């Protein structure tokens, strides 16, 4: 047996919410059994089919065998460490580089306290957090791309 909450359209508070485009979660169809028995298995099986299909259609190519006696000219880390690698490579003082890396999560922790005066959930109404996110993403991509270039053109990406 499922229980659904029928909307009481004579309620002035609900009418005001619906007029503003809010209040759509106050009623509707139940999660059991509709979502849990019908939608989730379809999503799980669809994701599984996509992964299997991609692995069959485009298998990963094997690289050349490793040679322990030949060291490459420049060793690069995995792609997700590129921005951190670039910070350590560009900053002359290694302690300053480590402090800059520690400043990133410390700065992210302070964002909710800076935005605490703003009560909106909409990211378009939280300009400080949105600007910090966009700026941080841009800097991380810039540093990540720059870490693949030689050290003399890594900050300018060879553009300037």
Swiss-Prot record:
Electron transport listed as a keyword: yes
Q: Which Gene3D superfamilies match?
A: plastocyanin oxidoreductase (1.10.287.980), Single helix bin (1.20.5.510)
Q: Tell me the domain of life.
A: Eukaryota
Q: List this protein's GO terms for biological process.
A: photosynthetic electron transport chain
List the InterPro entries.
Cyt_b/b6_C (IPR005798), Cyt_b/b6_C_sf (IPR036150), Cyt_b6/f_cplx_suIV (IPR005870), Cytochrome_b_C_euk/bac (IPR048260)
Q: What is its main location?
A: plastid
Record keywords: Chloroplast, Electron transport, Membrane, Photosynthesis, Plastid, Thylakoid, Transmembrane, Transmembrane helix, Transport
Q: Known Pfam families for this protein?
A: Cytochrom_B_C (PF00032)
Q: Which residues cross the membrane?
A: 36-56, 95-115, 131-151
Return one GO MF term. Answer: electron transporter, transferring electrons within cytochrome b6/f complex of photosystem II activity
Q: How does it assemble?
A: The 4 large subunits of the cytochrome b6-f complex are cytochrome b6, subunit IV (17 kDa polypeptide, petD), cytochrome f and the Rieske protein, while the 4 small subunits are petG, petL, petM and petN. The complex functions as a dimer.
What is the species of this protein?
Answer: Chlamydomonas reinhardtii
Q: Please give the name of this protein.
A: Cytochrome b6-f complex subunit 4
Of the GO CC terms on this record, one is: chloroplast thylakoid membrane
